[in-house]
Design a protein with these regions (language model features):
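Conserved kinase catalytic-core helix
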Residues: 30-58
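C-terminal structured domain segments across diverse proteins
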Residues: 49, 57-62, 147-151
Length: 244
Protein backbone atom coordinates (compact mmCIF):
# COMPACT_ATOMS: atom_id res chain seq x y z
CA UNK A 1 0.00 0.00 0.00
CA UNK A 2 3.01 2.33 0.43
CA UNK A 3 3.33 2.36 -3.37
CA UNK A 4 -0.23 3.64 -3.92
CA UNK A 5 -1.47 7.20 -3.60
CA UNK A 6 -4.04 9.65 -4.89
CA UNK A 7 -2.39 9.75 -8.33
CA UNK A 8 -0.64 6.38 -8.40
CA UNK A 9 -2.27 2.96 -8.75
CA UNK A 10 0.23 0.12 -8.35
CA UNK A 11 -0.47 -3.30 -9.83
CA UNK A 12 0.87 -6.74 -8.99
CA UNK A 13 0.83 -10.07 -10.79
CA UNK A 14 -1.67 -12.52 -9.31
CA UNK A 15 -1.98 -16.12 -10.43
CA UNK A 16 -5.48 -17.40 -10.95
CA UNK A 17 -8.06 -18.68 -13.40
CA UNK A 18 -11.02 -16.94 -14.95
CA UNK A 19 -13.98 -16.88 -12.59
CA UNK A 20 -16.49 -18.34 -15.04
CA UNK A 21 -14.11 -21.19 -15.90
CA UNK A 22 -13.89 -22.18 -12.24
CA UNK A 23 -17.65 -21.81 -11.74
CA UNK A 24 -18.35 -23.96 -14.81
CA UNK A 25 -16.08 -26.72 -13.48
CA UNK A 26 -17.82 -26.73 -10.09
CA UNK A 27 -21.23 -26.63 -11.76
CA UNK A 28 -20.43 -29.57 -14.04
CA UNK A 29 -19.29 -31.60 -11.01
CA UNK A 30 -22.51 -30.75 -9.19
CA UNK A 31 -20.61 -28.89 -6.46
CA UNK A 32 -23.26 -26.28 -5.78
CA UNK A 33 -21.69 -25.42 -2.43
CA UNK A 34 -18.48 -24.29 -4.15
CA UNK A 35 -20.44 -22.26 -6.72
CA UNK A 36 -22.44 -20.59 -3.96
CA UNK A 37 -19.33 -19.87 -1.89
CA UNK A 38 -17.56 -18.07 -4.73
CA UNK A 39 -20.60 -15.99 -5.69
CA UNK A 40 -21.30 -15.16 -2.04
CA UNK A 41 -17.76 -13.77 -1.75
CA UNK A 42 -18.29 -11.78 -4.95
CA UNK A 43 -21.56 -10.20 -3.79
CA UNK A 44 -20.16 -9.52 -0.32
CA UNK A 45 -17.17 -7.73 -1.86
CA UNK A 46 -19.33 -5.30 -3.83
CA UNK A 47 -21.73 -4.69 -0.97
CA UNK A 48 -18.74 -3.73 1.16
CA UNK A 49 -17.25 -1.52 -1.53
CA UNK A 50 -20.49 0.40 -2.11
CA UNK A 51 -22.11 0.48 1.34
CA UNK A 52 -19.02 0.76 3.55
CA UNK A 53 -16.13 2.11 1.50
CA UNK A 54 -18.09 4.29 -0.90
CA UNK A 55 -15.56 3.33 -3.59
CA UNK A 56 -16.15 0.48 -6.03
CA UNK A 57 -14.60 -1.18 -9.05
CA UNK A 58 -17.14 -0.36 -11.75
CA UNK A 59 -16.29 -2.93 -14.43
CA UNK A 60 -16.78 -6.43 -12.96
CA UNK A 61 -17.15 -8.35 -16.21
CA UNK A 62 -15.89 -11.97 -16.09
CA UNK A 63 -12.58 -11.01 -17.70
CA UNK A 64 -11.77 -8.88 -14.65
CA UNK A 65 -12.58 -11.62 -12.13
CA UNK A 66 -10.43 -14.61 -11.24
CA UNK A 67 -10.15 -17.28 -8.56
CA UNK A 68 -6.63 -17.81 -7.22
CA UNK A 69 -4.99 -21.08 -6.16
CA UNK A 70 -6.36 -20.66 -2.62
CA UNK A 71 -9.94 -20.24 -3.82
CA UNK A 72 -10.03 -16.49 -3.21
CA UNK A 73 -11.84 -14.18 -5.61
CA UNK A 74 -9.42 -11.79 -7.34
CA UNK A 75 -10.56 -8.48 -8.84
CA UNK A 76 -8.47 -7.06 -11.69
CA UNK A 77 -8.28 -3.66 -13.37
CA UNK A 78 -9.22 -0.80 -11.07
CA UNK A 79 -8.90 1.70 -13.90
CA UNK A 80 -12.69 2.08 -13.91
CA UNK A 81 -13.44 3.04 -10.31
CA UNK A 82 -16.26 5.17 -8.93
CA UNK A 83 -16.20 7.15 -5.69
CA UNK A 84 -19.58 7.87 -4.13
CA UNK A 85 -19.96 11.19 -2.30
CA UNK A 86 -20.93 10.47 1.30
CA UNK A 87 -24.44 11.84 0.76
CA UNK A 88 -24.96 9.34 -2.06
CA UNK A 89 -23.54 6.41 -0.09
CA UNK A 90 -25.92 7.18 2.77
CA UNK A 91 -28.79 7.80 0.35
CA UNK A 92 -28.49 4.48 -1.47
CA UNK A 93 -28.16 2.73 1.88
CA UNK A 94 -31.37 4.43 3.05
CA UNK A 95 -33.15 3.28 -0.13
CA UNK A 96 -32.03 -0.29 0.59
CA UNK A 97 -33.31 -0.06 4.17
CA UNK A 98 -36.65 1.40 3.08
CA UNK A 99 -37.13 -1.15 0.28
CA UNK A 100 -36.76 -4.04 2.70
CA UNK A 101 -39.46 -2.76 5.07
CA UNK A 102 -41.70 -1.37 2.32
CA UNK A 103 -41.40 2.34 3.17
CA UNK A 104 -42.19 3.61 -0.31
CA UNK A 105 -42.54 7.24 0.75
CA UNK A 106 -38.99 7.18 2.12
CA UNK A 107 -37.75 5.61 -1.12
CA UNK A 108 -39.42 8.29 -3.25
CA UNK A 109 -38.17 11.16 -1.09
CA UNK A 110 -34.62 9.81 -0.97
CA UNK A 111 -34.42 9.24 -4.72
CA UNK A 112 -35.62 12.82 -5.30
CA UNK A 113 -32.91 14.09 -2.94
CA UNK A 114 -30.31 12.09 -4.88
CA UNK A 115 -31.34 13.75 -8.14
CA UNK A 116 -33.75 11.27 -9.75
CA UNK A 117 -36.75 12.79 -11.52
CA UNK A 118 -39.53 11.65 -13.84
CA UNK A 119 -41.14 13.75 -16.55
CA UNK A 120 -44.31 14.25 -14.50
CA UNK A 121 -42.60 14.61 -11.14
CA UNK A 122 -44.54 11.63 -9.77
CA UNK A 123 -42.48 8.85 -8.15
CA UNK A 124 -44.35 5.87 -9.61
CA UNK A 125 -41.79 4.97 -12.28
CA UNK A 126 -38.93 5.38 -9.81
CA UNK A 127 -40.70 3.10 -7.34
CA UNK A 128 -41.27 0.50 -10.07
CA UNK A 129 -37.59 0.69 -10.98
CA UNK A 130 -36.62 0.23 -7.33
CA UNK A 131 -38.96 -2.76 -7.06
CA UNK A 132 -37.31 -4.37 -10.07
CA UNK A 133 -33.85 -3.91 -8.56
CA UNK A 134 -34.48 -4.67 -4.89
CA UNK A 135 -37.53 -6.95 -4.67
CA UNK A 136 -35.25 -9.99 -4.85
CA UNK A 137 -33.42 -8.82 -1.74
CA UNK A 138 -36.64 -7.94 0.08
CA UNK A 139 -38.18 -11.35 -0.62
CA UNK A 140 -34.97 -13.05 0.49
CA UNK A 141 -35.04 -11.11 3.76
CA UNK A 142 -38.60 -12.05 4.71
CA UNK A 143 -39.22 -15.44 3.09
CA UNK A 144 -36.27 -17.64 2.15
CA UNK A 145 -33.88 -17.55 5.10
CA UNK A 146 -30.97 -19.98 5.30
CA UNK A 147 -32.47 -22.27 2.64
CA UNK A 148 -31.19 -19.85 0.04
CA UNK A 149 -32.59 -17.34 -2.41
CA UNK A 150 -34.61 -18.51 -5.40
CA UNK A 151 -33.40 -16.46 -8.35
CA UNK A 152 -35.96 -15.62 -11.06
CA UNK A 153 -35.96 -17.60 -14.27
CA UNK A 154 -35.90 -16.07 -17.78
CA UNK A 155 -39.71 -15.84 -18.04
CA UNK A 156 -40.15 -14.10 -14.69
CA UNK A 157 -37.30 -11.73 -15.51
CA UNK A 158 -38.78 -10.79 -18.88
CA UNK A 159 -42.16 -10.13 -17.25
CA UNK A 160 -40.47 -7.69 -14.85
CA UNK A 161 -38.74 -5.98 -17.78
CA UNK A 162 -41.99 -5.67 -19.75
CA UNK A 163 -43.84 -4.16 -16.79
CA UNK A 164 -41.04 -1.67 -16.21
CA UNK A 165 -40.91 -0.65 -19.88
CA UNK A 166 -44.66 0.01 -19.89
CA UNK A 167 -44.28 2.20 -16.82
CA UNK A 168 -41.35 4.10 -18.36
CA UNK A 169 -43.27 4.76 -21.57
CA UNK A 170 -46.09 6.30 -19.54
CA UNK A 171 -43.82 8.50 -17.40
CA UNK A 172 -40.11 8.24 -18.29
CA UNK A 173 -37.26 8.95 -15.92
CA UNK A 174 -35.51 12.08 -17.20
CA UNK A 175 -32.79 12.59 -14.58
CA UNK A 176 -30.48 9.88 -13.26
CA UNK A 177 -27.28 10.58 -11.28
CA UNK A 178 -24.09 9.47 -13.01
CA UNK A 179 -23.11 7.44 -9.95
CA UNK A 180 -26.26 5.37 -10.28
CA UNK A 181 -25.53 4.58 -13.92
CA UNK A 182 -22.27 2.97 -12.81
CA UNK A 183 -23.97 1.15 -9.92
CA UNK A 184 -26.60 -0.25 -12.29
CA UNK A 185 -23.85 -1.38 -14.63
CA UNK A 186 -22.08 -3.20 -11.81
CA UNK A 187 -25.05 -5.01 -10.33
CA UNK A 188 -26.52 -5.72 -13.75
CA UNK A 189 -23.27 -7.48 -14.69
CA UNK A 190 -23.06 -9.38 -11.42
CA UNK A 191 -26.75 -10.24 -11.64
CA UNK A 192 -26.13 -12.10 -14.89
CA UNK A 193 -23.80 -14.48 -13.05
CA UNK A 194 -26.37 -15.14 -10.33
CA UNK A 195 -29.18 -15.76 -12.82
CA UNK A 196 -26.98 -18.16 -14.80
CA UNK A 197 -25.51 -20.20 -11.94
CA UNK A 198 -28.49 -19.96 -9.52
CA UNK A 199 -26.42 -20.09 -6.30
CA UNK A 200 -28.11 -20.94 -3.00
CA UNK A 201 -27.28 -17.91 -0.87
CA UNK A 202 -28.68 -16.63 2.41
CA UNK A 203 -29.07 -13.10 1.07
CA UNK A 204 -31.06 -12.05 4.11
CA UNK A 205 -28.21 -12.84 6.48
CA UNK A 206 -25.69 -11.06 4.25
CA UNK A 207 -27.79 -7.90 3.91
CA UNK A 208 -28.69 -7.85 7.61
CA UNK A 209 -25.01 -7.70 8.48
CA UNK A 210 -24.64 -4.50 6.47
CA UNK A 211 -27.87 -3.03 7.82
CA UNK A 212 -26.45 -3.22 11.35
CA UNK A 213 -22.84 -2.19 10.71
CA UNK A 214 -21.77 1.04 12.47
CA UNK A 215 -19.81 1.93 9.31
CA UNK A 216 -22.90 1.86 7.11
CA UNK A 217 -25.17 3.48 9.69
CA UNK A 218 -22.76 6.39 10.07
CA UNK A 219 -22.30 5.91 13.83
CA UNK A 220 -18.54 5.70 13.38
CA UNK A 221 -16.98 8.71 11.58
CA UNK A 222 -14.96 7.08 8.83
CA UNK A 223 -12.73 10.06 8.12
CA UNK A 224 -12.11 11.46 11.58
CA UNK A 225 -9.80 8.69 12.74
CA UNK A 226 -7.30 9.12 9.91
CA UNK A 227 -6.44 12.51 8.41
CA UNK A 228 -4.97 10.82 5.34
CA UNK A 229 -7.10 8.67 3.02
CA UNK A 230 -7.08 4.98 3.94
CA UNK A 231 -5.18 2.63 1.62
CA UNK A 232 -7.40 1.47 -1.23
CA UNK A 233 -7.39 -2.15 -0.03
CA UNK A 234 -8.78 -1.08 3.36
CA UNK A 235 -11.53 1.07 1.82
CA UNK A 236 -12.64 -1.87 -0.34
CA UNK A 237 -12.51 -4.33 2.54
CA UNK A 238 -9.65 -6.38 1.09
CA UNK A 239 -7.07 -8.15 3.27
CA UNK A 240 -3.38 -7.79 2.38
CA UNK A 241 -1.63 -11.12 1.92
CA UNK A 242 0.72 -10.37 4.82
CA UNK A 243 -2.24 -10.56 7.23
CA UNK A 244 -3.56 -13.91 5.96
Amino acid sequence: DSLCGRRVLTSEFVRGRKLTMVLDEHHQRGDQEAVSGILHALLDAWFRQVLVGGVFQADPHPGNLMVDDDGRVVVLDFGCTMTLPEAYRRGYFRVLQAAIVGERTVIAETLAELGFATRSGRPDTLLAFTDALLDQIRVAMVETGAAGTQWPGPEALMEQVRALLIRMEDDPVEKIPAEFVMLARVFGTLGGLFLHYQPRLDIGRLVLRYLTMPETLGDTPRQAATPEPLPWWQRWGLVPRAEL
